[in-house]
UniProtKB/Swiss-Prot annotation:
Known EC number: 2.7.7.7
Name listed for the protein in its UniProt record: DNA polymerase
Species this chain originates from: His1 virus (isolate Australia/Victoria) (His1V)
Catalytic activity: DNA(n) + a 2'-deoxyribonucleoside 5'-triphosphate = DNA(n+1) + diphosphate
Keyword Transferase: yes
Amino acid sequence: MAKCDKSLEAIDLDRAYTAPRKAKWAENKRINGLDTETSDGDIFCISVCWEGEKPMVQHNDREKLTSKQVWQVLTDHKARSSLNMWYNLDFDANVVLNHVCSEEQLAELVVSGTTLANSDRTYRQYMDTDKELRKGEYLITYIQSKFLEIKDHNSHIYTHYDASQFFYTSLENAVTEWLGESKANDGLEAGLFGSQTPNQLRETVAESDCVTWTNLSLTYNVSKGDKWTIHNAKSYISKNWSDILKYAQIDAELVRDLWQEAVNVGEELDIPMGRPFSTGYLAESYLDNRLREKPGLGPMPMAKMAWESYAGGRFEVLKRGNVGRVAGPDINSAYPAVLAELPDPKTLRWKRAKHASISEIETADYGFMTVKVSTDPTREIQPFAVKDEKQDKLVYPSPQNTEITVVKDIFIHAYNQGYVTDYEVIDCWLGYKTEGTTFPFDFIPELYDNRKTAEANGLEKRGLLLKIVLNSMYGKTCQTTPKRRELAESTELELHESYVPDMSLPKMIREKYSEGFIESLTAGAWFNPFLASYITGLTRLELHKQICKHDLEENTVMLATDCVMIEEKPFEESNFVENLVQDGLGYWDMEYKGDAFVLGAGVYQIDFDTCQKGCKDNCNKFSHKHKVKTRGFSEADLEKGLVNAAEKANGHIEIESTRPQTISEIIWSNEELSQVGNFLEQERKIKPEMDTKRKWSENTDFKKLLSTCETSLPLKI
């Protein structure tokens, strides 16, 4: 098995067989903006801007809000069946839920995604056999990073969404880009609403041996002559109360106006904006509205083989360290380009060919094969994705008599290019186009052209929403969602379900689920193994094909989804550059050229010769002349770049980050719920030997990598 550890039999496919849903438009829905202001995880005010009204604030005169006050805002009649938008709902939802729910309710919410809450925080189980809500009770559904939904005893629905995921930037930047306004804070520092660590505090204190900060009952020892800064959050809030209320109202109003503009732009483009759960759901809604019928899964044995062959995008580093001058060509909208040309698998003619010949496989239009294969271990870039069970990682090794399942196009390429030294076909499903074969996604080129036209004409908002739809379609074809339910006495497990015993659970969850619970994996509505495997498989294949075609295997530094990094001189001397087209769906384009320092997959720095933002020659902004990628880390944590951090590193690069703690992580790690919403300082490390997907020299350090380029060999499996 490649990318997914669950076989197709272990996935509930019911939703994949449903018809497209009716589009939900926003044109007749009220749009409201909301925001919380917190201190040490406690909510001291909620601001709300109802559509057509001036913003208001629910507060308790500088004190923590009561649960009743929170419920009043969340379930106001103006929030019913409305688009209630927040900016970074994850934070707000966590502090809100921790405010209004008991431990038992939160444990149930973390496990199942739903719980029954009420104004007095007492617990009553919501049974399948008794679904009637009582007055004062609310059925809560919360899916992290997606939405918070509340249902009351009158069956009124109040759904809250996260606007931030659609803008890819801060509220301040989004407001500037979309509304042409600035987000004025009147000198307020939101970070001061909560507790601060000593080096973040603001009021200078006199020299002393010891300072006691009574707000947290913490004592900090200070050496004589040092000056520390301290700050009492409660005091700061009290002194700046009127400004904070104004700040909160402005945020709520801006969020409302921001989403109103997004709705106006999106629905002009025929993108249904009425249920903005996520960027993926936006793409799903677009497909639901555009296509009358979903592509089918095709014959189930073929679909199982397709799922076995699915391996996602390719991230692999072949050279690391100071690799010198590089060129980085990439494919324009690679995944949408492949999807545009794929058929509905149920409209193909399929046949099983257990021991098919190479010629039979090659002449088929589509197909998947299980094969026992060996490849030439001296070749730098191997063609097949294999799960390394020891590392629990997807790697591209030199398989030796290894059984794999693969898209037939990838195997034929490897065979024709001389990679395959021995093979035995074990099973094969081959597909052929017929007169009735349909291509449901043939509208994608038009959508891509519309996006490019919008961007060229300065209509960046239209371009962004079209880009979201285009780039999010692929994810729907491989979407699976975990589901959990309580174990009942007479429960019989379905094939796609598994039992999670109580002894493996943390304390709060074990108290609620004393017998454990049942877990399953559910396919998304547009789940389709044929499409998922072919989209990613043909994209990986295109990278490899171009490298082989232009004899650049020994000069390739890195492969990353839809892009390759190649040593500049060999690249320029090849014919690859002739393939480059500035625009065009699925065509190659030049993303960058410059000096590269590479540590691992998605962790590198490119130094450009000139400013990439069109600034004057004296541009001194680091981000304009350098590209820093730190996959799995935040680029903001390396303001001066990866090279600078490596030069100062003592064995490893330390990256400190600060983020709010969530209910889920608190419960799963057996910590105190009082920590929810508090900001946790974390330290992560980037090590010089971070890449383990290939065979490297055993001893390396940053000093070596900064001065030399190291090469690698593929693993053997």
